[in-house]
Curated annotation (Swiss-Prot):
It comes from Leptospira interrogans serogroup Icterohaemorrhagiae serovar Lai (strain 56601). GO terms for biological process: bacterial-type flagellum organization; mRNA catabolic process; negative regulation of translational initiation; regulation of bacterial-type flagellum assembly; regulation of carbohydrate metabolic process. Keywords: Bacterial flagellum biogenesis, Cytoplasm, Repressor, RNA-binding, Translation regulation. This is Translational regulator CsrA. It is found in: Cytoplasm. SUPFAM superfamilies: CsrA-like (SSF117130).
Amino acid sequence: MLVLARRTNESIMIGDDIEIVIVDIKGDQVKIGVKAPRDVSVHRAEVYKDIQEENKKAAETKIKPADLGKIGNILKKKDSGKKE
């Protein structure tokens, strides 16, 4: 792990297009800003772990083929009711 010392308003670059800015330091809390392209996901570690767990649960969910047919029929009915 790379460890860097930074002060308020100083930043760190990751690659060519991600910048981490130290916004504020108060006591034992450091506020950071992340400047990154919109296609780059940025999450706090604890939120990211929750997202991974939910994705894992969703992938393990068993869907019966008959249920897929029902969902397809509902979507077809919904689409046929739209005006173009």
